[in-house]
Amino acid sequence: MLNERFSILVLLLILLTFSLG
């Protein structure tokens, strides 16, 4: 299972990707 911090980092990266794209 993934750590909570890792999943939060992934969500932030996805949000940054969508905002930049």
From Swiss-Prot:
GO biological process, one term: xylan catabolic process
Keyword Hydrolase: yes
Top-level taxon of origin: Bacteria
Catalyzed reactions per annotation: Endohydrolysis of (1->4)-beta-D-xylosidic linkages in xylans
Keywords per UniProt: Carbohydrate metabolism, Glycosidase, Hydrolase, Polysaccharide degradation, Xylan degradation
Sections of the chain in a coiled coil: none
EC number(s) stated in the UniProt entry for this protein: 3.2.1.8
Pathway per the UniProt entry: Glycan degradation; xylan degradation
A GO MF label: endo-1,4-beta-xylanase activity
Recorded family membership: Belongs to the glycosyl hydrolase 10 (cellulase F) family.
Protein's UniProt name: Endo-1,4-beta-xylanase A
Source organism (scientific name): Dictyoglomus sp. (strain B4A)
Upper classification of the organism: Bacteria, Pseudomonadati, Dictyoglomota, Dictyoglomia, Dictyoglomales
